[in-house]
Structures are given as structure tokens and as C-alpha cells.
Amino acid sequence: MGVRAQQKEKTRRSLVEAAFSQLSAERSFASLSLREVAREAGIAPTSFYRHFRDVDELGLTMVDESGLMLRQLMRQARQRIAKGGSVIRTSVSTFMEFIGNNPNAFRLLLRERSGTSAAFRAAVAREIQHFIAELADYLELENHMPRAFTEAQAEAMVTIVFSAGAEALDVGAEQRRQLEERLVLQLRMIAKGAYYWYRREQEKMAHHSE
């Protein structure tokens, strides 16, 4: 990569980080102004268009980055699990770490999931689908259950995790710890339910084939 390309990438990065830093519990992406984001990144507003077509393109890049960040973290969690950690507890603590360290990235995913822009809703849905698919792959490998079961289990788990994540954004450390314990219990119940359901289906099939 040439010096000019490196500089361009660095400025693009600064714009993404500037936009993330301006999000908060009170401030959504829709309320950000191009001028403010450019000022925070240290560039002239007119220079913004060398990096992004418009503010929406910046927002879609942020959605992609948020989803990718979360998926990479969960892959790291699976590596920690491979070294002997508890699957559900390690995954939950990794997810809560993500929210603690990147609250605005998670806020963006939550808000735009049901926001007014169809492009944003589609982008968030795609990121969540990637997340579900990766979890279903892992469950299929670990639990030796058919894809239909692991996909249903993964979808239920991700729905509950995102709901708990939304709560975790606005509570203190002690409440977050309680939330984590509740989430671990709920995910274990789903995992056990999926396993017993699968066993029951297997027994039914065996019974019919006799």
C-alpha cells in the first residue's frame, strides 16, 4: 500500500471512529451531522466525500464493522473454550466484555435493527444472520445434531443474548453481573431443551422404524 493510500485509509478510519465516539444513549446515528463527524476526525467537511459517498455509507460501514467485531470476539471465545472453559459462561462473559468495551457499536446494531432505513435494517439483519450461522456451525460440530436443530437453537440463543445486551447497556456493574447469571441460566435451559427435543425425535423415529 502506497503512502497516499495509507493516509486515505487512516483518514477513513478516523471518520468511522469519530462517528462511533459521537453515539450515546441519548444520540442516535440519524442525529449525527457530517460537519461534526468531519471536525472530530480533523478534516474539512468537503473532504468527507473523498472517503464516503454520503453519511449513510459511513453508517453502513459502521454496522459491518460492529458485526465483524462481535463475530471475531466470539471466535476468540470459542478458542478459550477449546482450552477448557465452560461454553456458555465463556461466551456470555465475552459478549458482556464486548458491550462494556464497545457500547456504541452495540447500540448502533440495536437501534438500526428496527430503524427507519431499509438499507440499515437489511445490513443489521445480515450481521445477525452471520452470527447465528457461525453459532449453528459450532453447535453442529460440538453436539452432533442436524442443522435444523442447531439453527433453531442458535437463533433462540442470539435473540435472548441481544435482549440481555440491550439491558446491560444501562445498568451498573452489580446489575450486569446478575444479568450475566440470568443469561447463563437461560442459555443452559435452551441448550438442554434442544438436546432433549432432539433425543425425543430420535426415539420417535426409532420407534416408527421397528
UniProtKB/Swiss-Prot annotation:
Q: Which gene encodes it?
A: fabR
Broad class of the protein's primary localization: cytoplasm
Name used for this protein in its record: HTH-type transcriptional repressor FabR
GO molecular-function annotation terms?
Answer: DNA binding; DNA-binding transcription factor activity
Question: What Gene3D superfamilies does this protein map onto?
Answer: Homeodomain-like, Tetracycline Repressor, domain 2
Supply the InterPro entries for this chain.
DesT_TetR_C, Homeodomain-like_sf, HTH_TetR, HTH_transcr_repressor_FabR, Tscrpt_reg_HTH_FabR
Q: Which part of the chain engages DNA, per the record?
A: 33-52
Protein task: Represses the transcription of fabB, involved in unsaturated fatty acid (UFA) biosynthesis. By controlling UFA production, FabR directly influences the physical properties of the membrane bilayer.
Q: How does it assemble?
A: Homodimer.
Q: What HAMAP family does the record point to?
A: HTH_type_FabR
Q: Name one Pfam family in it.
A: TetR_N
* One Gene Ontology cellular component annotation held by this UniProt entry: cytoplasm
